[in-house]
């Protein structure tokens, strides 16, 4: 490389052209003589990786052929070098700018030829695919089969259920041990089983496993590490006579007795929770609060006794959580052993396994790490705010060599936006955006992109009005949250092509009116008829699918980009599941009766045995896809958009099963029962999806639906548990699953940790809503629940009269 480049960190707000800037960097490297095979560009989705390659080829072709494009590139890079203080690079590009256009274009032609000749060695892909390449490249050294492959999501769900079985077997045949495992994973403090126990068990274990890998050496449920100064102790006070209670507090002693008998799994009444809320004052001997809607003061021994009972309750729940955390740590350790055995035997990996294997078994092994070090000289990392600690741990030893380069011959370039860090729930850590450069600040240049090329000026004005730090201060958000948000705020300026453009409005609706309102908006705007795009964003897949059904009934074409179990959809999904059951067991009368009464009744018109025989024959000749196409040929779905889309989903299920290597109809029946369909985009259709799924996309009309209900809160600081946390005290690193808010508030160390949970929740929700609002190109509509007036709020059930739980 003829001149030096700097390491570069770019902070890019939504719609400001980070892909453009990243491909500029790749073109720059190519024009400076870097071989394509020495460049590594990583992002998080295959779609984004494909976009990189497409934009790169377009940029090289334009520079090679279009008048003035090569000169514009050199001038752009010259100005950027000047702004960054890179004088040598600025002089280099100034000389390029002065050269004849024919010579400028020739440089681009040479770079384009170099890329096309070496296209198969150009590494532009996802972070997961790169980690997989690392693992597969050293499979023999890792004790893995060379045919190692990554499970797709449907196959991974089957794998996880089998892993649970292996884990239970490893823990022993004792029924009590198995019952304890189940209680730990799905019972929790509330004693309430989730709607889908298996999926809940898997999620709980996966979170424990992730932290177990990220926190090596931490003590799980270590009381000494978490509470180095010890926990507050319950006072030794005899029960008083309760003769001098405030007026209207006659049943206060009943609430004290309730708490004395309560423990993990107990649902506390609102009255009993008053003891927790006022525990500090009660323990001190004086507390003033409202009980039975009567304000009063409790003092002396009655107060101290109530405080000691509340403290005893807190101690019981903390002890239970510590024990449960210790068991979760043991499960995570045993789970790692189970996975190692299974992957060495079958060569099947999850995406979540890749960072751990790459870190522990590849980059930490000197011989293997040395072989990796020479792979790439220039690293370009996209969407860096979504990188997890475990992923970075796998890359860091390799990138460390890049940081050490003082000659400018090897570089790191990373881009991100901490305002769009919406994947913390799966391990993404926005703090890495600044942390990884600590110690190398002198070698790193910073660049900010704040000019939006996506959104109309009026849309950006709304974004600023809601999200700029001053607005958050006016809204009285936690000052620590505002300070953290301010660090990542880069502002938003509209490009001149979007000045005075855009439309923003708010519509109020809740319940059944939400989707009627959305349908009206789409029909009024007529964006689809004009060839534009419409995105409707929700917070959950379930709500998106609910909307898809209603909007389809309104005559609108809809596709859902989230994932949903096909077998629960409309009348067709369950009918296909019954068909699979009958193909497996023709003697199943219940399945036969259900099939005759449903959408696939014509398929069994000639009898059950002919149907089963035909299904097996179709499976033998065309796999699961051929079999389900045979079933669907008997269904009358023509003209019904919803059913046509659902039929396509059923076919995708068959195709996915065939690709997973499944070999029998019985296996397909199990597979189909658990299959989560990724959906498909339809031209001229409303694209319904979760906000998470919309990341990286843009729509001419964006409708954001924020709904209440079903456990969903519109509060920014909503902290739905459980929270498995890690930290450090002078006594060492620890891991603990936090108890409920009320219990945490009674213990200083846990109160501080729960406060951090709340701050993280606020930041995560700010990021989520920022992503939602910045998807809009021309029009943004927010559909929100009506604001309840004071009179409406007064009708709500009082906190004392409601049930609570700690």
What are these regions (language model features)?
Residues 13, 38, 68, 190-348, ...:
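Conserved ATP-driven helicase/translocase motor core recognized via long
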């Amino acid at each position: 490389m003829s001149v030096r480049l700097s390491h570069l960190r770019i902070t890019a707000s939504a719609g400001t052209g980070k892909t453009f800037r990243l491909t500029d960097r790749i073109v720059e490297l190519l024009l400076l003589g870097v071989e394509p095979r020495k460049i590594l560009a990583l992002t998080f989705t295959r779609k984004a990786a494909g976009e990189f390659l497409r934009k790169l080829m377009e940029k090289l072709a334009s520079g090679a052929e279009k008048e003035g494009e090569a000169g514009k590139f050199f001038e752009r890079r010259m100005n950027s070098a000047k702004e960054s203080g890179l004088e040598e690079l600025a002089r280099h590009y100034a000389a390029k700018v002065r050269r004849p256009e024919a010579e400028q274009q020739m440089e681009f032609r040479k770079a384009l030829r170099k890329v096309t000749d070496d296209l198969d060695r150009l590494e532009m892909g996802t972070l997961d695919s790169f980690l997989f390449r690392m693992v597969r490249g050293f499979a023999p050294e890792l004790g893995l089969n060379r045919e190692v492959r990554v499970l797709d999501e449907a196959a991974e769900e089957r794998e996880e259920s089998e892993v649970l079985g292996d884990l239970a077997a490893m823990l022993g045949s004792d029924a009590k041990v198995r019952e304890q495992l189940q209680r730990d994973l799905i019972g929790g403090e509330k004693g309430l089983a989730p709607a889908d126990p298996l999926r809940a068990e898997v999620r709980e274990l996966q979170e424990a496993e992730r932290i177990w890998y990220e926190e090596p050496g931490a003590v799980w449920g270590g009381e000494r590490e978490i509470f180095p100064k010890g926990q507050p102790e319950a006072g030794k006070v005899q029960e008083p006579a309760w003769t001098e209670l405030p007026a209207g507090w006659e049943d206060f002693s009943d609430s004290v007795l309730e708490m004395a008998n309560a423990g993990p799994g107990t649902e506390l009444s609102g009255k009993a929770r008053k003891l927790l809320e006022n525990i500090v004052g009660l323990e001190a001997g004086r507390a003033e609060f409202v009980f039975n809607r009567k304000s009063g003061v409790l003092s002396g021994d009655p107060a101290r006794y109530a405080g000691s009972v509340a403290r005893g309750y807190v101690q019981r729940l903390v002890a239970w959580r510590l024990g449960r955390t210790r068991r979760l740590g043991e499960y995570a350790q045993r789970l790692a052993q189970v996975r190692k055995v299974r992957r060495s035997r079958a060569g099947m990996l999850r995406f979540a396994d890749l960072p751990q294997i790459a870190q522990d078994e590849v980059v930490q092994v000197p011989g293997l790490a040395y072989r990796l070090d020479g792979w790439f000289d220039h690293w370009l990392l996209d969407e860096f705010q979504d990188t997890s600690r475990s992923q970075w741990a796998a890359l860091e030893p390799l990138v460390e060599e890049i940081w050490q380069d003082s000659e400018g011959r090897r570089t790191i370039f990373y881009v991100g936006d901490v305002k769009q860090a919406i994947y913390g729930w799966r391990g993404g850590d926005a703090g890495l955006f600044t942390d990884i450069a600590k110690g190398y600040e002198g070698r790193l240049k910073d660049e900010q992109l704040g000019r939006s090329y996506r959104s109309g000026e009026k849309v950006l004005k709304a974004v600023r009005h809601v999200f700029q730090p001053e607005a958050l201060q006016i809204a009285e958000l936690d000052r620590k949250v505002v300070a953290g948000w301010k660090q990542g705020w880069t502002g938003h300026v509209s490009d001149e092509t979007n000045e005075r453009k855009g439309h923003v409005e708010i519509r109020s609706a809740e319940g059944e009116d939400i989707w009627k309102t959305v349908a009206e908006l789409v029909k009024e705007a007529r964006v689809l008829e004009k060839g534009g795009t419409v995105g409707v964003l929700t917070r959950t897949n379930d709500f998106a699918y609910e909307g898809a059904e209603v909007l389809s009934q309104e005559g609108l074409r809809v596709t859902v980009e989230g994932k949903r179990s096909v077998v629960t959809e409309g009348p067709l999904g369950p009918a296909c599941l019954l068909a699979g059951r009958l193909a497996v067991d023709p003697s199943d009368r219940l399945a036969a009766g259900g099939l005759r009464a449903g959408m696939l009744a014509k398929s069994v018109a000639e009898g059950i045995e002919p149907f089963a025989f035909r299904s097996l024959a179709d499976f033998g000749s065309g796999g699961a896809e051929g079999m389900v196409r045979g079933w669907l040929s008997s269904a009358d779905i023509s003209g019904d958009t919803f059913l046509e889309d659902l039929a396509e989903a059923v076919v995708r299920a068959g195709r996915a099963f065939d690709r997973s290597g499944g070999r029998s109809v019985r296996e397909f029946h199990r597979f189909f029962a658990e299959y989560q369909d990724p959906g498909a985009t339809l031209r001229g259709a409303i694209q319904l999806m979760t906000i998470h799924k919309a990341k990286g996309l843009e729509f001419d009309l964006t409708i954001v639906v924020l709904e209440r209900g079903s456990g969903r809160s519109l509060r920014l600081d909503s902290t739905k548990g459980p929270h498995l946390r890690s930290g450090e005290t002078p006594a060492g690193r620890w891991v603990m699953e936090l108890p409920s808010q009320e219990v945490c508030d009674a213990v200083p160390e846990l109160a501080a940790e729960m406060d951090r949970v709340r701050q993280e929740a606020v930041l995560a929700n700010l990021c989520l809503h920022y992503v939602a609002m910045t998807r809009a190109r021309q029009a943004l509509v927010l559909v929100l629940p009506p604001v309840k007036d004071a009179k409406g709020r007064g009708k709500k059930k009082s906190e004392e009269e409601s049930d609570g739980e700690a």
